[in-house]
Amino acid sequence: MKIEAVIFDWAGTTVDYGCFAPLEVFMEIFHKRGVGITAEEARKPMGLLKIDHVRALTEMPRIANEWNRIFGQLPTETDIQEMYEEFEEILFAILPRYASPIHGVKEVIASLRERGIKIGSTTGYTREMMDIVAKEAALQGYKPDFLVTPDDVPAGRPYPWMCYKNAMELGVYPMNHMIKIGDTVSDMKEGRNAGMWTVGVILGSSELGLSEEEVENMDPAELREKIEVVRNRFVENGAHFTIETMQELESVMERIEKQELIIS
């Protein structure tokens, strides 16, 4: 079996180490309403279409109960829409600062292209958001062959439609000749639902939630423990393989191709 295409996520996988761009904004829009949410809570739905992310936060029992205590009712669709509009406004202003390719990504992409492998991408960002991120990333040397946003398909993750559209545009079939790689639980579900080899990348991921500086300065034993927690989370949610850095991706591809593995 030959791998013909790799479909990458964006924030936390190929750009924005640690996926920090949306994190503070999610926390801020709730804080402004007197409802404090933690970074861990804010990260949990990461990878979803952003309005679905806001909705998922309002459905978390602790957050819903706190909202009900303050406002005397649960969050409404109007509340969700208002928060999402605020989220967009703030995020658009900061996105250009969070579009730098993660270390090693450009080199891996170049190596894949030398092997004739096509490069696709999916995201939880809207097309308007990605117009900003993709433009800035391209200026810094990262540009996949194709990009699909949730706006382009009936629904975003965990549905497989963005992966299917990549497959059609890249001209690759069957789906088990493709790899989906990402940094969130929703990425793992998206890849699995699409019938693709699914890989979770740990360092730089939203699931790990650490900056490069934090990774560098953390006690090695503590860091190893956190890495293993994320690894297990990926596997529990469908990952066929996990890698700590993007540089390990090609060895995963070789395992698939040489051992003639079958997706289960």
Curated annotation (Swiss-Prot):
Catalytic center residues: D9 (nucleophile), K50 (schiff-base intermediate with substrate)
Signal peptide: none
Main EC class the enzyme belongs to: hydrolase
Name of the protein this chain belongs to: Phosphonoacetaldehyde hydrolase
Cofactor binding note: Binds 1 Mg(2+) ion per subunit.
GO cellular component terms, semicolon-separated: cytosol
EC number: 3.11.1.1
GO annotation (BP), single: DNA repair
Purpose of the protein: Involved in phosphonate degradation.
SUBUNIT field: Homodimer.
Binding-site list for Mg(2+): D9, A11, D183
Cofactors (names): Mg(2+)
Catalytic activity: phosphonoacetaldehyde + H2O = acetaldehyde + phosphate + H(+)
Family classification: Belongs to the HAD-like hydrolase superfamily. PhnX family.
Alphabetical keyword list: Hydrolase, Magnesium, Metal-binding, Schiff base
Single GO MF annotation: phosphonoacetaldehyde hydrolase activity
Key word Magnesium present: yes
InterPro entries noted in UniProt: HAD-like_hydrolase_sf, HAD-like_sf, HAD-SF_hydro_IA, HAD_sf, PGP-like_dom2, Phosphonoacetald_hydro
